[in-house]
C-alpha cells in the first residue's frame, strides 16, 4: 500500500506503522507497542486465512508436486538480506562472513493477539524443535543447516521452516535463499557459485514466486548479480520488488541517484522499489535492539534531506516494507488460487491414473496372494480375447491389431495381382511359342491342357515365398501385440512377465511352424488345377464379355464383329482360359492364406497362450515367485499414494477456503 503524504506526516517515533517488535526488547513505550500491533489490521480477516492456506499446503508437501505462491528473498553476500529478514521477523538469524544461509529458509510469520506469548518452531526433515525465546532461533537454524548440508560450507536445496508467532510480527511468509557468491573460499566446493545460482533459479523462475531482490544502496544496481538473475527469469519485472539497504553508507553527493533508483527511474520494475535501514555490524556490537533500530531508522529517513521524500511516498522503512509485502503476498495468492485449484485437480487425476498402472499392493496372505494372481491372469486373458475379437481399447493415433492385419492382407492381395500382371509378358511369349512350335494335332482354338497346367502351376508357385514373408510379418505383429498386453498387466512383476514372454515365444514358434506347413500344403494343392465347372464357366464368360467390351470401346462394333485371323483367335482363346482360371485362383489364395494365418497365428496362438497362463495357477508354490515386484515398484506405489493423499487433502482445504 502506498501511503498518502498526510498519512506519512502523522508517522513519528510515537506512532510508527505496525512493525515487528521482538518480545523482551526494551526501550519502547506502551503507546508505541499499541501502534506496532496495528500491522495489517485492515486486512486481518482475510490476510491470515490466505497465508495459512498456502502455508498448510506447503506443510502438506504440495510444493513437491506444483509451485505455490511465495516471496523469495535473494541478494549478494553482504547485501543486508539477513538484516532485512531480522527486522521483519524480530528474531536474530545466523550471521557471519561467507555463506550463512546454506539451505532455503521458509520464514512463516504469524501475528497473534495482544498479550499472547511468543512461540517459535524450527522444522527440517522429520525433526521439530520448539522454541520459547527469540534468542534460540539462531542456534536452532545453524543446527538444522549442519544436519541437512553437513558441517562446513556446503549447501542443500532441502527446506528449513521457521515458524514465528507473536503479537509483534506481520502476517507474512518469506523464503530466504543463500547469498550469491562468485569465488569458493576455504573448503567450499569449487563450483559453489554455480550450485547457489542453480538453487536460487529453481525458486525465482517459478511464475508463482514474487522475487524480493536485496541490493545495497552504495553499489551500482545495474551490475548486481541478484537483480541480473531476477531479470533473466522475469525480464518485464512483473513479479520483482527491489529492496535497497544500507542507505547510511551512500557516498555524499550520490543520494539523488539512490532516490532515482527507488522512484523506478534507473532499472524499471513494475512492482518498484523500497528502501530500508537495518542494524549494521556496529549496531549489533553495541547491542542495539531491533526495536531501537526501528526507531533509529524512522529518525534517519525523517531527518535525511534527500530520503525524507521517500518516507513521505511510503517507499521507506521496514514497517512500510512489511505492509507492502503482506499486501503483495495476499494479492498474489488471491490471483493464483483459481489456477492452483485447477493444477491440483489435474495433478490428482494424473496421479490416480499413474497409480492404477501399478495396481494394488500384493497381499501377504497366501490364499489372498493366489486370488490376486488369478485376477491378474484373468485380466491378461480378457485383454487377449479383446484383441482376437477386435475389441481392444486403443489410445488416440493408435490402431487395433485387426487394422494392422487387414493392411497386410490387402498388400497380399495386391502382391498376387502384381505377380500375375508381371507374368503376363512371359505368358504371352510362352503361349506364342507353343502355338508356333509345339502345337500338335489340335485344331486352331484348342489349348494343349498340359501347357495350360504348367503355365498356371509356375505362376502360382511364385507366390509361395511372398506368402511366407507375410506369415512372418503378421506373426511379429501379433507377438508384439501380445507382448504389449503382458507389459501392461505384468510389467511390475518381472518373473511373471518373463515367464509370460517365454511361453509366448514358445507358442509363437510352434504356431508359426504349423501355419507354414499349412500354407505350403495349400500351395501344393494349388498345383492341382481344379475349379468347379459352373464357377469356371462363369469366370470364362465374364472374361470374354470384358474383352469384347474393351474391343468395342477401342475399335467400334463393326471392327469387333469382323473375323480375326486364326492365329490371333487361337491366342486370344488361350489367354481367356488362363485369365479365367487365374481370377479364381486369385480369389482362393487371397482369402485362404489370410484365413490360415488368422487361425494359427491369432486364434490358436491366443487360445494356447491363455491356457498356458491358467496352468501357472496349478503350481501354488510359485505364486510368491511370480508376484515378486521390481525393487522400486512398491516404493513408487507408496510415493504415488502419498502424493494422492496430499493432493486430496489440498483439494479439501481449497474447497473449505472462503475465498
Curated annotation (Swiss-Prot):
GO process annotations (BP): cellular response to type I interferon; defense response to virus; endosomal transport; negative regulation of intracellular transport of viral material; negative regulation of viral genome replication; receptor internalization; regulation of cell cycle; regulation of nucleocytoplasmic transport
Matches recorded under InterPro entries: Dynamin, Dynamin_GTPase, Dynamin_GTPase_CS, Dynamin_N, Dynamin_stalk, G_DYNAMIN_dom, GED, GED_dom
Residue ranges, annotated region (G3 motif): 176-179
Stretches assigned to the GED domain: 571-659
Molecular function GO terms recorded: GTP binding; GTPase activity; microtubule binding
Domain Dynamin-type G: 65-338
PANTHER family: DYNAMIN (PTHR11566), INTERFERON-INDUCED GTP-BINDING PROTEIN MX1 (PTHR11566:SF217)
Official protein name in the record: Interferon-induced GTP-binding protein Mx2
Organism: Rattus norvegicus
Organism lineage string: Eukaryota, Metazoa, Chordata, Craniata, Vertebrata
Gene behind this protein: Mx2
Amino acid at each position: 500500500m502506498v501511503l498518502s503524504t498526510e498519512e506519512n506526516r502523522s508517522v513519528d517515533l510515537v506512532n510508527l506503522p505496525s512493525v515487528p517488535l521482538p518480545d523482551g526488547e526494551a526501550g519502547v513505550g506502551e503507546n508505541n507497542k499499541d501502534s506496532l500491533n496495528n500491522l495489517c489490521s485492515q486486512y486481518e480477516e482475510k490476510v491470515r486465512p490466505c497465508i495459512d492456506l498456502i502455508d498448510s499446503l506447503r506443510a502438506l508437501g504440495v510444493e513437491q508436486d506444483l509451485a505455490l505462491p511465495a516471496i523469495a528473498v535473494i541478494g549478494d553476500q553482504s547485501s543486508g538480506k539477513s538484516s532485512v529478514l531480522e527486522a521483519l521477523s524480530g528474531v536474530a538469524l545466523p550471521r557471519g562472513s561467507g555463506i550463512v544461509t546454506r539451505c532455503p529458509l521458509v520464514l512463516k510469520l504469524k501475528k497473534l493477539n495482544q498479550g499472547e506469548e511468543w512461540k517459535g518452531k524450527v522444522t527440517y526433515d522429520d525433526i521439530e524443535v520448539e522454541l520459547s525465546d527469540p534468542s534460540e532461533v539462531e542456534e536452532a537454524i545453524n543446527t538444522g543447516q549442519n544436519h541437512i548440508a553437513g558441517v562446513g560450507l556446503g549447501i542443500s536445496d532441502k527446506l528449513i521452516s521457521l515458524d514465528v508467532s507473536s503479537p509483534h510480527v506481520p502476517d507474512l511468509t518469506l523464503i530466504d535463499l543463500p547469498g550469491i557468491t562468485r569465488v569458493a573460499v576455504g573448503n567450499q566446493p569449487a563450483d559453489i557459485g554455480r550450485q547457489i545460482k542453480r538453487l536460487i533459479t529453481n525458486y525465482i523462475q517459478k511464475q508463482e514466486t514474487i522475487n524480493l531482490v536485496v541490493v545495497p544502496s552504495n553499489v551500482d544496481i545495474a551490475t548486481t548479480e541478484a537483480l541480473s538473475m531476477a531479470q533473466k527469469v522475469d525480464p518485464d519485472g512483473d513479479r520483482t520488488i527491489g529492496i535497497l539497504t544500507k542507505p547510511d553508507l551512500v557516498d555524499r553527493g550520490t543520494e539523488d541517484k539512490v532516490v532515482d533508483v527507488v522512484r523506478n527511474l534507473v532499472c524499471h520494475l513494475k512492482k518498484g522499489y523500497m528502501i530500508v535501514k537495518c542494524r549494521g555490524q556496529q549496531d549489533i556490537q553495541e547491542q542495539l535492539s531491533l526495536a531501537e533500530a526501528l526507531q533509529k531508522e524512522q529518525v534517519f529517513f525523517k531527518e535525511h534531506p534527500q530520503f525524507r521524500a521517500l518516507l513521505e511516498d511510503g517507499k521507506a522503512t521496514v514497517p512500510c516494507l512489511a505492509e507492502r509485502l503482506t499486501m503483495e503476498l495476499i494479492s498474489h495468492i488471491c490471483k493464483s488460487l483459481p489456477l492452483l485449484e485447477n493444477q491440483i485437480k489435474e495433478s490428482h487425476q494424473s496421479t490416480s491414473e499413474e497409480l492404477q498402472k501399478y495396481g494394488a499392493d500384493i497381499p501377504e496372505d497366501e490364499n489372498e496372494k493366489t486370488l490376486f494372481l488369478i485376477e491378474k491372469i484373468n485380466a491378461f486373458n480378457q485383454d487377449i480375447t479383446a484383441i482376437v475379437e477386435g475389441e481392444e481399447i486403443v489410445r488416440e493415433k493408435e490402431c487395433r491389431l485387426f487394422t494392422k492385419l487387414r493392411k497386410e492382407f490387402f498388400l497380399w492381395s495386391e502382391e498376387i495381382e502384381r505377380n500375375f500382371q508381371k507374368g503376363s509378358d512371359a505368358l504371352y511369349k510362352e503361349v506364342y511359342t507353343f502355338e508356333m512350335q509345339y502345337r500338335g494335332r489340335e485344331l486352331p482354338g484348342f489349348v494343349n491342357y498340359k501347357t495350360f497346367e504348367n503355365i498356371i502351376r509356375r505362376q502360382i508357385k511364385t507366390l509361395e515365398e511372398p506368402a511366407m514373408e507375410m506369415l512372418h510379418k503378421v506373426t511379429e505383429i501379433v507377438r508384439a501385440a501380445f507382448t504389449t498386453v503382458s507389459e501392461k498387466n505384468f510389467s511390475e512383476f518381472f518373473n511373471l512377465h518373463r515367464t509370460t514372454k517365454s511361453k509366448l515365444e514358445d507358442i509363437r514358434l510352434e504356431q508359426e511352424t504349423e501355419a507354414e506347413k499349412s500354407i505350403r500344403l495349400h500351395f501344393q494343392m494349388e498345383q492341382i488345377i481344379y475349379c468347379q465347372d459352373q464357377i469356371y464357366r462363369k469366370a470364362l464368360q465374364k472374361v470374354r464379355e470384358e474383352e469384347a467390351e474393351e474391343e468395342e470401346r477401342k475399335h467400334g462394333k463393326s471392327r469387333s464383329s469382323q473375323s480375326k485371323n486364326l492365329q490371333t483367335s487361337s491366342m486370344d482363346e488361350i489367354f481367356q482360359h488362363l485369365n479365367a482360371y487365374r481370377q479364381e485362383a486369385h480369389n482362393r489364395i487371397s482369402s485362404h492364406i489370410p484365413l490360415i494365418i488368422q487361425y494359427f497365428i491369432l486364434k490358436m496362438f491366443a487360445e494356447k497362450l491363455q491356457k498356458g497362463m491358467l496352468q501357472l495357477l496349478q503350481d501354488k508354490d510359485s505364486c510368491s515367485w511370480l508376484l515378486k515386484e521390481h525393487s522400486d515398484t512398491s516404493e513408487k506405489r507408496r510415493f504415488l499414494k502419498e502424493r494422492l493423499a496430499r493432493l486430496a487433502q489440498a483439494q479439501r482445504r481449497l474447497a473449505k477456503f472462503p475465498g
